[in-house]
């Protein structure tokens, strides 16, 4: 509904944003599914609200600033904006040869929790959070530590408290699992030596070495869409599957125990079908 009457946003075959029309356009949808495919009962007919944690809500404490200092202690160069009015930085700084998405606005898990009454009033029954685990970037699709909330957002305990409070209001929490690749600056790959354990690129004796596909060790490795900061993993590797999916203390099971109700899988189309079945 607009001042000029109804407008319909419809796809136009370009693959981009589509076009606005003054009348409803005819179209079609082809949906193919297995009749016996089961989805969680709580998710059916749920009202989902997506949150990008860094930009949603803030807490009246020093969580974000302490998290920034933690990342600096790893040799990283994050920036914390003073207000939401400041523009997003999308260009390289003087000391960089390429853009690094590491400017933050300071949203936190406690900030999200403070907005739960508002979200409940909207009728939300499921919160889908973009990645919350420790990572170098503000989007956090370059996981550094799968088992730890990014300190800029808070703590693992903050996450559990958020889930408990949300569940009491009839709201479930869904997490974003990024499992086709890790960050190069991570516990697992450790390209810059920021973490104490031996990462895959630091030696073949690393417990994570078998996760990755090195064509020529240590500099030439398979990476997601050619981005060297996103080394791809072998999702059929037994050690990886045990750590992330099937082990008693796996990443998937740990976050469910902490209070998450389900997972959205990043680039699920790039994960092997048998790995998807294992996760389910």
Task: Give the positions of each predicted feature.
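Short linear motifs at secondary-structure transitions and domain/linker junctions
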Residues: 22-29, 122, 207-210, 269
